[in-house]
Amino acid sequence: GKVEFILEVRGETEEDIQRLVANIKAEWKKIRKARQVDVKEQNILNQKPVHLDMDIVACIEKAAQERHVPIVRLASMAGHDASHMADISKTAMIFVKSINGKSHCPQEYSTPDDIEIASNVMLQAILNVDEQLD
């Protein structure tokens, strides 16, 4: 038989990612030996973790506090547009609550109320950034 799968490894730092990949390779080595199978790997994409701008994060958190919206800092660990924009601009992200935490899948759903809350936080955050520029 043959098995193919894609494994996406994410981490907050390159060191975290490298450590996890090393552990995975060590397990593959054990599997090869124990089961007498061939394991082939291919690195399709290697993206470095991106740290977003803390000044912008502070403006977002201030906006959330002003609107009594709970704040949860979340490391996305996914390649979003923000990770590409961070090369040329100050960048941060606002995550919209989704039902059962589902994201980037057909079951993803955010209520109109949650979208409105996040949109108003974003608007206030933009105004907060604008105040800093004056």
Per-region residue spans from a language model:
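A short beta-alpha structural unit
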Residues: F5-E12, V37-V57, M77, D81-S83
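Anion (oxyanion) recognition and catalysis
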Residues: K33, Q65, A86
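A glycine- and small/hydrophobic-rich beta-loop-beta segment
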Residues: G1-D38
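Flexible, glycine/charged-enriched surface loops at secondary-structure junctions
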Residues: K30-Q42, H68-A75, E131-D134
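His/Asp/Glu-rich mid-to-C-terminal helical/loop segments that flank catalytic regions of hydrolases
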Residues: E15-D16, V21-E27, V96-D134
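NTP/phosphate- and nucleic-acid-binding module
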Residues: E61-A63, V129
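Short glycine-/small-residue-rich flexible loop motifs, especially phosphate/cofactor-binding loops
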Residues: K29, E61, A82-S83
